[in-house]
């Protein structure tokens, strides 16, 4: 009777410089959804301001440094706006951390220099004009280097288009309004604000899907490179 022996196999190739990305992706996804929820909440308050109508005393910011006392609804809008800002900061911290990991992993997988230097992971969000394309470019470059030959998911472009639209028509790239100015805009013309909030919510949801798609593609590539086939005979 012959004995069955295990034939030793060569160890799987090791990819050096990889960073764990699954936990960062999960936290980033939840942070994006939390930020989207914040924009939903602020949209509700903007509708409440619009339906209530501007008080007879006029807008909160009456010009020349004069501000009238806020009513209870306006005070609560300030609080909601503050909470939205907090969720955006949390989202930014997790998102940038995820971007760093995905970018570093793409370099380890491809052994090629990234298209954008590391400082663009931060500055790409805040420099005028550059912030219209560089953050998306960093992610797209990391995806293409991680899975060469695979088409960039459409959700990457959809997420970025919604983000830029939401920032442009609301409070960001064009408007730098205080909460009091936003209250005034809600009283007199709420629709641009609501379009902005809707776009930001959609950007949060598509961003969640984008993070999952990019992370899944990268982890799949890593798994294919590090798998150890077993042969028995």
Walk through the language-model features, giving the residues of each.
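Membrane-interface extramembranous regions at the lipid-water interface
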Residues: 2-73, 94-123, 130-164, 169, ...
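Interfacial helix-start motif at the membrane-water boundary
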Residues: 67-88
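Generic signal for short, ordered secondary-structure residues
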Residues: 81, 85, 105-106, 190
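Alpha-helical transmembrane segments of integral membrane proteins
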Residues: 84-91, 196, 200
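Membrane-interface transmembrane-helix boundary segments in multi-pass integral membrane proteins
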Residues: 188-198
């Amino acid at each position: 009777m012959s004995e069955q022996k295990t034939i030793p196999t060569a160890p799987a190739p090791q990819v050096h410089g990889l960073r764990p990305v699954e936990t960062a992706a999960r936290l980033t996804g939840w942070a994006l959804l939390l930020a989207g929820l914040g924009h939903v909440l602020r949209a509700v308050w903007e509708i409440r301001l619009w339906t209530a109508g501007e008080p007879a005393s006029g807008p909160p910011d009456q010009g020349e440094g004069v501000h009238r006392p806020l009513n209870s609804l306006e005070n609560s809008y300030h609080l909601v706006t503050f909470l939205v800002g907090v969720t955006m900061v949390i989202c930014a911290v997790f998102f940038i951390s995820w971007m760093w990991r995905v970018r570093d992993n793409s370099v380890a997988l491809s052994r090629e220099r990234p298209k954008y230097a590391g400082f663009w992971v931060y500055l790409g969000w805040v420099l005028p004009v550059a912030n219209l394309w560089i953050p998306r470019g960093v992610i797209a470059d990391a995806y293409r280097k991680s899975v060469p030959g695979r088409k960039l998911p459409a959700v990457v472009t959809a997420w970025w288009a919604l983000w830029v639209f939401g920032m442009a028509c609301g409070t960001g790239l064009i408007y730098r309004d205080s909460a009091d100015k936003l209250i005034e805009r809600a009283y007199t013309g709420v629709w641009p604000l609501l379009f902005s909030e809707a776009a930001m919510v959609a950007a949060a949801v598509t961003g969640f899907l984008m993070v999952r798609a990019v992370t899944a593609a990268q982890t799949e590539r890593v798994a294919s490179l590090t798998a150890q086939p077993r042969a028995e005979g």
